[in-house]
Amino acid sequence: MAMNYSAKDEVDGGPAGPPGGAAKTRRPDNTAFKQQRLPAWQPILTAGTVLPTFFIIGLIFIPIGIGIFVTSNNIREIEIDYTGTEPSSPCNKCLSPNVTSCACTINFTLKQSFEGNVFMYYGLSNFYQNHRRYVKSRDDSQLNGDPSALLNPSKECEPYRRNEDRPIAPCGAIANSMFNDTLELYLVANESDPKPIPIPLKKKGIAWWTDKNVKFRNPPGKESLEEKFKDTIKPVNWHKAVYELDPEDESNNGFINEDFIVWMRTAALPTFRKLYRLIERRDDLHPTLPAGQYFLNITYNYPVHSFDGRKRMILSTISWMGGKNPFLGIAYITIGSISFLLGVVLLVINHKYRNSSNTADITI
């Protein structure tokens, strides 16, 4: 039996179905997206449009990069490594496994005065806070003061969820590994006078406002913090309970302790720094940290040699762009210079071949 051919049938995806049945077709819906009729714009790249773009990018990026680089260089910063792995280091004695509590002192010199507010950081190296299991090892409901989560922490906190059949507060690997060295800074104002001047270190104002006031809360109730946490136990590696982090200041104790909050904000890279203290400017007439001799008193509690880590203390001022970061300025200058150089090269090529084309046209 012969079948009549119909161009319409081919376009529609096949012959019509039996009478009364639904028409079968493989043709996509007649929409602009499925029929690829969406409006499009394709720039026509000519020398008149490309060359100015390269030059404009170069002329914008280079001055911005120079400004950022100069600003970064004007930031005062000094790093003091106190890991103690070197035999000559004053903190080398603290690496002995038999030492339970150790203190050491490191002398250093500030060659230039530090103006304005000065920020003291502690820095760690080779510490991978971005490990997936480590990052997830916390209970945000518990940290937000939820009474039920306080007594029944999340399973994400394992193996730091319970100890001695009691819930750990705060639970998880992040809290368990909290940095606990104590750093004190002193100025040697007069070498003939052995009594140093302690530098006042402010321990509040170092955490993000949203963390301090929204994400972290102590359990509700009028009882003392010790009563609120009486059915819990401290993390395995802690020397004291969470309600003893700052017993002299109730607004900085427990889950809302700012040292604890800063530590709980995990770092993305294995080498990082976290804000430890603030050194506020006294007045406009005197530098915050005058040039001279200083020494750093360290209560060495935090072990890093087991994972080949390093510890350091950083003193730094800041600017409108934050802390010292020469890379950003160098990146802007590099990109701007490459763009400007490409513009010059393309301009020479365009000028050369355009003249050759004009000469060929005249010859013909």
From Swiss-Prot:
Chain ranges passing through the membrane: 50-70, 329-349
Tissue specificity comment: Expressed in photoreceptor cells; detected in retina outer segment (at protein level). Detected in hepatocytes liver sinusoidal endothelial cells and kidney brush border of the proximal tubules (at protein level). Expressed in brain (at protein level).
Disulfide bonds: C91-C104, C94-C102, C157-C171
Cytoplasmic face residues: 2-49, 350-364
Keywords, comma-separated and alphabetical: Acetylation, Cell membrane, Cytoplasmic vesicle, Disulfide bond, Glycoprotein, Golgi apparatus, Lipid transport, Membrane, Transmembrane, Transmembrane helix, Transport
Its membrane topology: Multi-pass membrane protein
Protein's name in the database: Cell cycle control protein 50A
